[in-house]
């Protein structure tokens, strides 16, 4: 009878404690009957009480029905009905019993998985009896660890500060704390000893697996939201579990649950604060700035101070951003200029529309020994510390662009640098026209159209003001050999009413060549032109009549009379002309008739001037030489210009800043003579 009871594990608890580890109750689970029999035999030799089963589900059922019948569980890892790791998790959560895993797989990954899932040991098959004789240590270790956790919780509760909870404000003291005289209080010692005795009793109750456990509280999203609302209402510093519990008003929620969650919530807030402080410290150490607080509006770039970086700008490659006419319908560059300072601006085909009344000043200043940076503007040797920029967007009948710079005479020599060695324009336009201008304190140009002109005009540092559009940009066309070539020069009595493509170049000084590129597209009756006016005369310029007016005038005259233009130049003293200028300006214009009766006229103007600051414009005479490979149009109506292209470029075609200007629009009507061969240019200060 006694042996049967011992075999079934119904031995009294007092007797088991006296003979421990003899009589320790072990549950063995393995699907292999041979291994299970060997394991049972070895456990019996160690004087353990063994219960065996070959299914994990049956073992779990036995544990749930009789929690106090077993002290240890030995389970195989690989079983058909249930994985050994799954059984390990369920036993650890429900019974809190030590579980030893047994398997033939001794890989580190598998062993680590078993330990992380809560296994107290991992044995390899075939198991040895020496290993089974010491498995009782896990049972003792688990009991003492449970008791230590209970004592630790009680110690923390006993030594809790009085101001941590409202329940401890009155009458609760720290165990063993000295009184006012510095001696430990006897009453407090007695109180703590009584609490320890109660803790031992509670520990014995905890050791009993049959004792019911407290229900676990799952903090759902809604429950946590109520908790956070209560904490925010009370304040994180004044929030105590009792007050939070009253505000939450949730059933089956105890003060201990709220206290534990409050502690975790405070740790979470501290961690967030530490991360934020670390980020701020890193930003401060690296010298960073808030990317949003210091941003200015796109429209308001007033007071923009130039960077003073000493690093030179890198040159653009031939296939770079400014290499294609599509991406760069207009460019401004220099050639053969000293490489001491470099200026470079970005010109694209994006649409930028601004009011003509919006004038933004860019304060640009660079030391003489430093080089300009990308997007920085003009170099310091231009003598300009301010630059006003206005973007003109006229949708009706006029697109006028005026370049006015009062700092061109302050020393434009040797300040621009070519940033590329490859041409921006196609190979056909590799031979660019070049002209030399005298530094003028004021230069103004205008481009008038009867219809909406769409184009892209790029200038250094945003000096040229026009509408930049990506809707329709015209690729630059070159000079073909079969085109109608017209060669001529200007004088002060000639006026040119030709519409089409014109190219001209102007340098900052006589030793350097300046290139300006411009590409503009107009409608079938649109016309565009640019001219420069000196300050010594009336600052008016030709207003090309667009649309039906110009075409109607062309219809009434022959083409022969068209090629006899007349430009009226401002009167200039002959002494200045003789002393300062000996120049010959030639215009090369080309007609290229296409299937849509469109015409492209190329104009080439070459001028020479001295490097002095004279504002005198040389007299120029215009003569035309028509090649015989194409017949002259009989009717002037064939000369209607559907598109206007104007390029100002050079062989190197670098994209640098040239003019530091203020935009101003002036227009004036033009009176044509009876023979349509004369027009009035009131004054021309420089040639572009």
From Swiss-Prot:
Location(s), subcellular: Nucleus
Q: Where is this region: Disordered?
A: 161-212
Q: Where is the composition biased (Acidic residues)?
A: 193-208
Which keywords does UniProt give here? Activator, Cytokinin signaling pathway, DNA-binding, Nucleus, Phosphoprotein, Transcription, Transcription regulation, Two-component regulatory system
Boundaries of each Response regulatory domain copy?
25-140
Give each disulfide bond as a residue pair. none
SUPFAM superfamilies for the chain: CheY-like, Homeodomain-like
A Gene Ontology annotation in the biological process aspect, one of them, is:
cytokinin-activated signaling pathway
Output the Gene Ontology cellular-component terms. nucleus
- What does the protein in this record do? Transcriptional activator that binds specific DNA sequence. Functions as a response regulator involved in His-to-Asp phosphorelay signal transduction system. Phosphorylation of the Asp residue in the receiver domain activates the ability of the protein to promote the transcription of target genes. May directly activate some type-A response regulators in response to cytokinins.
What PANTHER family does UniProt report for this protein, alphabetically?
A: TWO-COMPONENT RESPONSE REGULATOR, TWO-COMPONENT RESPONSE REGULATOR ORR23
Q: What is this protein called?
A: Two-component response regulator ORR23
Species for this entry: Oryza sativa subsp. indica (Rice)
